[in-house]
């Protein structure tokens, strides 16, 4: 039996999604909880491996099991065995053609910036703090240069293991809600650190340190060293993964917090 799960987590206390020896990971916690409910070892496959400190409101995973359980066991039962900063939001049996990573047609991330002179207290792990006057209109206009299938070498981490730097960005929006700036970006897939590297460079435009054409210039340069520093991890959320309609997976509000679609 193959089961898909929708997962939400606060990544601030973990060394990323991927299971690692001797450090705490989201995958490790989930596999441990699932194995208790299934009464057998469970191995997970995910839609997107998030880095240390990065969060998710719409992560999707799947696993194989011989255990016969109802959906309540895979949600309430697993949640009872998870720490408070990880939660299963839904569970659904899927056919053998479904794969959390390879069946996905798009991923969507949101990066949340707290734009204020003083750092936040309550949301310090869930937003990135940047002071100074950020012009979101300039950021949004500049970001449109990223649309379409392009070579994103300038926005991939040096240690990125992808065989190709090409990705297809479907949409990118930069908006403001009061003191919060939200960068919302969707693509077929993302390179390692791609979203955070894009945000870091967009911020330079928003702060007036670079011209509107800078994103297009960076794409043409194909040189990571020419772009801005990587934005902090704590403002980044994986909010949605898109799959073909044949799988009929649940669609929940994207989040995080008060963010509107």
Curated annotation (Swiss-Prot):
The enzyme's first-digit EC class, named in words, is isomerase
Catalytic-site annotation from UniProt = 51 (nucleophile)
GO molecular function terms noted in the UniProt entry: RNA binding; tRNA pseudouridine(38-40) synthase activity
UniProt-listed Pfam families: PseudoU_synth_1
Q: What is its EC number?
A: 5.4.99.12
Its UniProt entry gives the catalysed reaction(s) as: uridine(38/39/40) in tRNA = pseudouridine(38/39/40) in tRNA
Q: Which GO terms describe its biological process?
A: tRNA pseudouridine synthesis
Name the residues that bind substrate: 109
Write down the InterPro entries for this protein, in alphabetical order.
PsdUridine_synth_cat_dom_sf, PsdUridine_synth_TruA, PsdUridine_synth_TruA_a/b_dom, PsdUridine_synth_TruA_C, TruA/RsuA/RluB/E/F_N
Q: Which terms are listed as keywords in the entry?
A: Isomerase, tRNA processing
Transmembrane region positions? Answer: none
Q: How does it assemble?
A: Homodimer.
Biological role stated in the UniProt entry: Formation of pseudouridine at positions 38, 39 and 40 in the anticodon stem and loop of transfer RNAs.
Family note: Belongs to the tRNA pseudouridine synthase TruA family.
| Record's protein name | tRNA pseudouridine synthase A
Q: What is the lineage of its organism?
A: Bacteria, Pseudomonadati, Pseudomonadota, Gammaproteobacteria, Alteromonadales
Which gene is this protein's source?
truA
